Amino acid sequence: LDNMRISRLTSTGNARQAAISPDGRYVVHVVREGGQESLWIRQTATTSNVESVPPADVRYDGVTISQDATYVYCSAYEGTQAFSSLYQVPALGGTPRKILEDIDSPVSFSPDGSEFVFVRGIIEPRGADLMVARADGSGERVLASSRGSEIFLNEQPSWAPDGTQVAVAYVSYLKNGNSGVMTIDVASGATRPLGET
């Protein structure tokens, strides 16, 4: 912490939903202006911000940069759409490509970048699923489910550097609505509240 340096990256006052690339070279953020939102990217070594996706009638709900920093993955609500969709966008600008629908958290990548994990809320019965899909959005599958008294929150999960576990926030209605972190074994789908053996 002695060598930590804090720098202001934007000064407009309308930036939200930011993410940094795994190699620390890029920062992506959302700008909201006039009821529309756009996606911007910046090289940390420079002071210039580049518009990656122009303003549109969307609400970005989470942004993540891929492991190799070539793509930005952003979940977004279009207009009055009830469910968020996941888009893959070339990091330095290009046309967004919809790769998934019905996603309720930012994604988190596996260490090799071949897959990502995300949360999908379930309305009835109340709950949420922790989902895994390939980097192109194909092959989605349920890694773990939560229903009833302990439910995954719509927050970004975190894939462990060794690839064996995923951590996800959850709320426990058995413990007066307290929240915590649960780990999920990628191979078996077994869940365990963090700190318990």
Cite the ranges covered by each PLM segment.
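Acidic, proline/glycine-rich low-complexity intrinsically disordered segments
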Residues: 1-197
